Amino acid sequence: MKKNAKIYLLKDRPDYIKKLSDDDIINVIGTKGSGKTTSANKYIYNDDYIVINCDRLYDMPTDSKIEDEFLPKVKELLIKKYGKVYTGKDFSICYDEIINFAKKNKKKLIIEGNVIYDIEPITKLKGTVIVKRTGILKCFLRAVFRDYPTSYFLKLEIEKHGPIIGRLSRLKNIIKRRKSIFKEYHRIEKDIEELENDA
């Protein structure tokens, strides 16, 4: 495993897939820009599945209009029960609630987002884990080009600095924020190692 843990800049590697339990759950993890949402959204119009994009649980501004009809219900349930949607290691509480919600509704579950790999140990996940292993430079560029034009943030920068400086400021800020992808990449490789070592 360590031999393969080097950074792949452009080359994609096959997704890492591991079944942890017989639950009808697919957990899709990977760095920003790795294709998690694209993979999960293939099931969004399939009535057998609930597709939860974790970023949308936190009201992160997006220009995307695609959202599972159950997502607002899940969010409402979490806020009603806990007062908020937990982040970090505490997300495991929300994770269990989301699983129970899917089971009560007799649906298979696809859950995707970076907050999933805050659950420790990663082997606590249920069902199948799919780790997207897209080349790191490709992830970085995808994330920058996807997130740069998000109208909410772009509008704030333009209002603050004017049309030209505002756009440059937005680009600078998004590049700075998306540098975290390189740290995430190594963390995900460690998660794969942990999954590999799990009997």
Question: Where do the model's predicted regions map?
Answer:
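N-terminal pre-Walker A segment at the start of P-loop NTPase domains
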Residues: 1-17
